[in-house]
């Protein structure tokens, strides 16, 4: 995502990496549990929301969105708890309800929502009965934002400029072909995924 690329750039004073192409736009959403009692932004007070990793793209988006709506996370003196949880773990957190034992809730047992990239956002909806609260595209001009890009080490670009140009040319041509042949591209991708994973 963009944040690791920015971190690499900033930590090296601009010397370590170069972003040479975009790879994906969009594909992230805030999904909430059906029974979480969340229908508007202010309903997030006192809730537990998962993000894939502290400081990653979705985590930053979640924290910025909360701040925009006047909320603070618990680590900043507020009442919204952000839970760093890998995407597969979000499914588990999402379906668990807080269990009560001896009159108190067990900790780390559930999440009321998650800001997740695809395909995990859709999986939360379809496999965990979640509800799409916000498609992140709604927050961006022209509904476009970077979720992945191609980053190359600066020394590699300097040592192999022709190879980088050839790879970039192929990337652009393939992207154009996919965008012009979506049905065929999906069939090819699904066939290859089935071959690699042995699953439909």
Q: Language-model segments: what does each one mean?
A:
Residues 194-200:
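Acidic/histidine-enriched active-site and ligand-binding environments that engage anionic O-linkages
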Residues 1-85, 91, 99-118, 133, ...:
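Short, glycine-/small- and polar/acidic-enriched structural segments
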Residues 2-4, 36, 89-194:
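Pocket-lining segment of extracytoplasmic ligand-binding domains
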